[in-house]
Amino acid sequence: MKINSKKMKYLSKITNSIYEDLKIEFLYHSNHLEGSTFSKDELEKLLTEKKVEGSHSLDDIIETKNSLEVFDQVINDSGEKLDKFMLFNWHKLLKKGTVDDEIHNIGMWKKYENKLRGVDLKLALPVEVDNLMFNLLSNYNELETVTLKDIADFHYKFEKIHPFQDGNGRIGRFIILKQCLEWNIDLIAIDDKYDDEYRNALYKAQKTGDSEDLVTVFKKCQNRLDEKLEKYKNLLEQVDVDMQN
């Protein structure tokens, strides 16, 4: 489902509608990939009623609440140039009040070497991060047009750099959201139905530089999201009319 930045900002002002459903759908899957225990119903309760249901760690509660705020910030930032200061702000919003806020410099590149559990992948050293991210962002911002493959390539390179001490997966998927909005590409929410395929395709791309499988997973996730949001087709058509008037 294609929704550009302007339309998404318009939709954000319509209560009890597609914006909230999309927000829940995107965040549920993205957070679940990182071990969040919130169900969709519990996430919706937190969003709409500011109530926490279920048994969750304090950090999970705080970071889930923060992710709702980051989503809105990403929408607000769509259309603006992607740079490290924007990423710093997203990371600070995501991690404020968590354990990481107490022991790490949130909203900054990592200070200590980090690693991924269960995979043989060497991540960038802290001293390398600023230069690598400068090159990644510069090359992306110089593109005259952005394709799904460009988004996949950016994603695997970002995750291989792993520029923050923690929270890289979530920030990386927020970047995907921003990119899709800005280039009128069908939105991507990494559905947990394709969790293993996503992880395997991401790892393959990071090891070989071949993002073909990752593009395939993105397409599956696009189709899955389309199916879930089909009920809003008429609303989106009406919004198009309203925005032209």
Residue ranges and their predicted role:
Residues M1-N245:
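FIC/Doc superfamily catalytic core
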